[in-house]
Amino acid sequence: MKRMIALDGAQGEGGGQILRSALSLSMITGLPFTITGIRAGRAKPGLLRQHLTAVKAAAEICRATVEGAELGSQRLLFRPGTVRGGDYRFAIGSAGSCTLVLQTVLPALWFADGPSRVEVSGGTDNPSAPPADFIRRVLEPLLAKMGIHQQTTLIRHGFYPAGGGVVATEVSPVALFNTLQLGERGNIVQMRGEVLLAGVPRHVAEREIATLVGSFSLHEQNIHNLPRDQGPGNTVSLEVESENITERFFVVGEKRVSAEVVAAQLVKEVKRYLASPAAVGEYLADQLVLPMALAGAGEFTVAHPSCHLLTNIAVVERFLPVRFGLVEADGVTRVSIE
């Protein structure tokens, strides 16, 4: 009988990252786990619709036996079966993040018996989760370098809090994992600003772009008007293309927050990234831990290790025979497999 891994959901950042990482790793390794205190560090602890959808999606893909899979549950037992490729569709039923559900199940499908397609409906532009364009334009090119081939398509936007968006990813089994070396980002090649609008006046986007232009030299400035029924919503993004990596930063607009303030938040985040010589931003660092661990080698630099990153590393080390090293030097933290 395989050993049971016991996890404390209050560990580290105390949110859903522990659960998502554990589900991915359990499916890959075949190791069962229990987790208590799910999202103990949040104002509303326990499983929300997004987390419950991730659990049910993982269970369907690997025919797992699950206990505690219900809204509000703070305890879960997950016994995985065999991962099967196929065509899967999952509905969150709220504006919960589609990409976080995909993030949970796609790594397991790298080990499936054939190609797969996973479609998730819910929220696509959520202030607490990476949008589909981040996955598509930033993460997936790096995964391709590692021998991981998946392609994400944003079918329909769904802004928080209404939801209604659809994201799909096609993924193939991985033949061989390659190592990723991202010690330096290199010189900046170009920067691109983009604003999405749905049911929001165009002058909002124009003011957001003006704020970005006031701080950066942009090679491109794009405003995309989406159908009104995909909103109301607004997202402003800035993409930084460097010699070795492309990073993308975003802020989701909020009611009663001016366009200038929304864009200024983005400017602050991008300036913080550019102020450090680190190659990888905070969100991307979280996403690279698992594929790097599966490759068994590699490294990247980040300005500061976030609580999400440290939590993710701790969970990975419980399931896989790897150890990460974090070394601070020259204004960055170098994260590597020891």
Swiss-Prot record:
Q: Which InterPro entries match?
A: RNA3'-term_phos_cycl_insert, RNA3'_phos_cyclase_dom, RNA3'_phos_cyclase_dom_sf, RNA3'_term_phos_cyc, RNA3'_term_phos_cyc_type_1, RNA3'_term_phos_cycl-like_CS, RNA3'P_cycl/enolpyr_Trfase_a/b, RPTC_insert
UniProt-listed Enzyme Commission number(s): 6.5.1.4
Q: Name one GO cellular component term.
A: cytoplasm
Quick one: where is this thing mainly located? cytoplasm
Keywords assigned by UniProt, alphabetized: ATP-binding, Cytoplasm, Ligase, Nucleotide-binding
| Broad enzyme group | ligase
Short name of any one Pfam family annotated for the protein: RTC_insert
Q: Where in the cell is it found?
A: Cytoplasm
- Listed GO MF terms: ATP binding; RNA-3'-phosphate cyclase activity
* Any single GO BP term: RNA processing
Note the superkingdom of the native organism.
Bacteria
Q: Where does this protein hold ATP?
A: Q103, Y283, L284, A285, D286, Q287
Which residue positions are annotated as catalytic?
A: H308
Membership in a protein family: Belongs to the RNA 3'-terminal cyclase family. Type 1 subfamily.
So what does this one do? Catalyzes the conversion of 3'-phosphate to a 2',3'-cyclic phosphodiester at the end of RNA. The mechanism of action of the enzyme occurs in 3 steps: (A) adenylation of the enzyme by ATP; (B) transfer of adenylate to an RNA-N3'P to produce RNA-N3'PP5'A; (C) and attack of the adjacent 2'-hydroxyl on the 3'-phosphorus in the diester linkage to produce the cyclic end product. The biological role of this enzyme is unknown but it is likely to function in some aspects of cellular RNA processing.
Q: Which NCBIfam families match?
A: PRK04204.1-2, PRK04204.1-3, RNA_3prim_cycl
This chain's protein is named: RNA 3'-terminal phosphate cyclase
- The scientific name of the source species is Escherichia coli (strain SMS-3-5 / SECEC)
